Regions:
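Bacterial N-terminal signal peptides that target proteins for export
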Residues: 3-24
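Hydrophobic membrane-targeting alpha-helices
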Residues: 18, 29-34
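Low-complexity, acidic/polar, glycine-enriched regions of mature
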Residues: 36-199
Length: 199
């Protein structure tokens, strides 16, 4: 039997809880994609993750993360990224939705308080394009991902833009009644825009 939360989500086209939760999973992989030896200005940056529930797209957002990063466009292959995301910091704009996101069927934040991305290689992809390969771990499940990034430099400021699709099922996010991908899409697509000041 579906939970009351399911019926609320099914009726609500503007702010269903599950779609933003799924969007957040994918965001985890992107913070390692371009915070290139710099401090990110959160007020000017955005990470928008989109998935679909019953064919309706919805966005979502993480509030806490830490990153140890090293990236020089002149020596991209020597760069590295090590990122930790607080899975309990995903904010859907309502306390009950946030608690749902932290629950066992989704991030299980009590058991897995952090999701991580650790780069293994950074490769030029032509012009100001780069591909960052690394291991993304969520709920104890790891997958190798390749994050495409566009880096733009203006004076002391760098911006990093890109998108990445992942499958929530590969990380056991959305289990039980939420495992049905005909209701909640398996694919999550992240678009990010990060603004940073060079150190």
């Amino acid at each position: 039997m579906k939970s009351n939360f399911y019926h609320l989500a099914a009726r609500t086209a503007v702010r269903p809880a599950i779609r933003p939760i799924l969007a957040g999973i994918a965001a985890l992989s992107l913070f390692g994609a371009g915070l290139a030896h710099a401090d990110v200005d959160a007020s000017k940056s955005s990470v928008i993750a989109t998935t679909k529930q019953m064919n309706v797209p919805v966005d979502g957002k993480f509030k806490k993360f830490s990153a140890q990063l090293n990236f020089d466009p002149a020596k991209p292959t020597a760069g590295s990224a090590n990122v930790s995301i607080d899975t309990g910091s995903y904010d859907l704009g309502a306390d009950d939705y946030n608690k749902q996101a932290q629950g066992k069927e989704w991030f299980d934040s009590a058991t897995y308080p952090a999701a991580t991305f650790v780069s293994s290689a950074i490769a030029p992809a032509g012009g100001n394009q780069y591909k960052i390969t690394g291991k993304l771990t969520i709920k104890g499940k790891s997958q190798t991902v390749v994050v495409p990034v566009t880096v733009t430099a203006q004076g002391a400021t760098q911006t990093f833009d890109g998108s990445l699709p992942i499958k929530r099922s590969q990380f056991d996010v959305g289990t039980g009644e939420w495992k049905d991908t005909s209701v909640v899409a398996d694919e999550v697509v992240i678009k990010f825009h990060l603004v940073a000041s060079k150190k």
